[in-house]
């Protein structure tokens, strides 16, 4: 109860600070409340009409390169948005249960999560044997691969920023806390002339208490102007009536659980069903006698990697996976002896040129025999995925785990998604192409 009272006081101080920044906070239609799962969410205080403006956040209350660069010397101009916002949070991280001493954004920083023990990047980066580290050995291969990629992004930013943190004696652990706040809570906010510039992001008070769910209804952001920067940001109710006390959600996008887990640190049953099968397909290719050649041919055509299977919106395999499986279904004597031979049409082996035509859109299918072999190979792949997922889930059931049940459940959801996507494809009449 004491912790919730403290969080409520922080919420009240945040609203007072926002009011001082120009926010119209009288009769505020939303508030942060505890959820039944132990976390927090954003809830409607009163009934809301469809598309009604719920709240507006002044541009000066958001953390982005426009609001932070004036607080630092010229070296800050060279930092990316992620690096600069993370650096500022790191410098002003609250100590223990205390409040942030930042004179510019302290009341907001004090409302941010105090730790990210639940996030897999913490398990990977923290020294001293994090208690959840054992779960890293039980992640799907594609999830662990993407997590290592995230670690590289973090390490790169830490290498740039650490020299600007020595005066306040901040550690890599402090920067990890700050960086994960940025990576998990920032929203798109236009500050650059190019709409696709990676620096178009900001931490936005109040909005960042809203949880994600894959399907609507959702709140929607409405900037007061598209550009130039420094636009206030309004948030409108979903296009349906919202009752008093209902939770308000925000959408991070139609992500599969691999993305949600690696980037945001959670997984949801019912997320967009997708399984990355790069490790299985690439492993199969590399074990073949003609594996090096097959890899080169796929690379030359731009079809190496990013192989996926899906259960929604309809069960299917990606065209990239289909291209690879068709190539592997050609008789081993058909591909040219080197990629250079493909330059000469006269030396194209039987079936290889037709395979290329399926990539360019001038041909829909290969011969019935090759398509049948492709179907068999896809079925074997999907069966392998299902069996691997079942084995992984059984191993998790027998793991000596003393941590929180919801953390273990996240990892199980990843494997359940792989199993269920495979099941869905097997229950359909392949081929689906």
Residue ranges with predicted function:
Residues 2-61, 66-70, 109-433:
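Long, positively charged leader/targeting segments at protein N-termini
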Residues 66-121:
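Eukaryotic helix-linker segments that join adjacent hydrophobic helices
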């Amino acid at each position: 109860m004491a912790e919730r009272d403290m969080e409520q006081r922080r919420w009240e101080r945040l609203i007072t600070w926002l009011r001082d920044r120009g926010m119209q906070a009288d009769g505020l239609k939303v508030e942060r409340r505890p959820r039944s799962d132990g976390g927090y969410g954003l809830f409607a205080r009163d009934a809301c009409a469809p598309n009604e403006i719920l709240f507006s956040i002044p541009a000066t209350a958001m953390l982005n390169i426009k609001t932070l660069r004036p607080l630092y010397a010229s070296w800050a101009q060279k930092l990316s948005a992620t690096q600069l916002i993370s650096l500022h949070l790191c410098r002003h991280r609250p100590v223990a249960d205390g409040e942030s001493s930042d004179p510019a954004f302290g009341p907001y920083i004090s409302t941010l999560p105090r730790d990210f023990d639940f996030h897999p990047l913490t398990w990977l980066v923290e020294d001293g044997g994090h208690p959840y580290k054992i779960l890293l050995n039980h992640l799907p291969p594609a999830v662990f691969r993407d997590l290592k990629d995230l670690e590289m992004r973090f390490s790169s930013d830490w290498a740039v920023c650490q020299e600007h943190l020595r005066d306040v004696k901040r550690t890599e652990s402090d920067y990890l806390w700050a960086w994960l706040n940025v990576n998990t809570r920032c929203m798109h906010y236009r500050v650059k002339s190019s709409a696709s510039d990676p620096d178009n992001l900001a931490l936005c008070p109040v909005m960042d208490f809203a949880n994600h769910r894959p399907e609507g209804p959702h709140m929607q952001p409405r900037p007061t102007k598209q550009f130039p920067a420094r636009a206030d940001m309004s948030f409108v109710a979903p296009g349906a009536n919202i009752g008093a006390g209902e939770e308000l959600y925000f959408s991070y996008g139609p992500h599969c659980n691999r993305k949600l887990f690696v980037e945001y640190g959670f997984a949801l049953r019912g997320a967009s069903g997708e399984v990355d099968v790069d490790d299985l397909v690439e492993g199969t290719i590399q074990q073949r006698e003609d594996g090096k050649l097959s890899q080169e041919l796929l690379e030359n055509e731009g079809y190496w990697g990013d192989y996926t299977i899906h259960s929604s919106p309809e069960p299917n395999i990606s065209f990239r996976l289909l291209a690879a499986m068709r190539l592997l279904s050609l008789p081993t004597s058909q591909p040219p002896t080197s990629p250079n031979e493909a330059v000469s049409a006269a030396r194209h082996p039987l079936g290889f040129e037709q395979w290329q035509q399926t990539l360019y859109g001038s041909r829909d299918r290969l011969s019935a025999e090759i398509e049948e072999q492709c179907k068999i190979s896809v079925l074997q792949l999907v069966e392998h995925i299902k069996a691997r997922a079942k084995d992984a889930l059984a191993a998790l059931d027998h793991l000596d785990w003393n941590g929180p049940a919801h953390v273990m459940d996240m990892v199980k959801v990843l494997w359940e998604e792989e199993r269920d996507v495979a099941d869905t494809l097997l229950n359909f009449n392949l081929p689906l192409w």
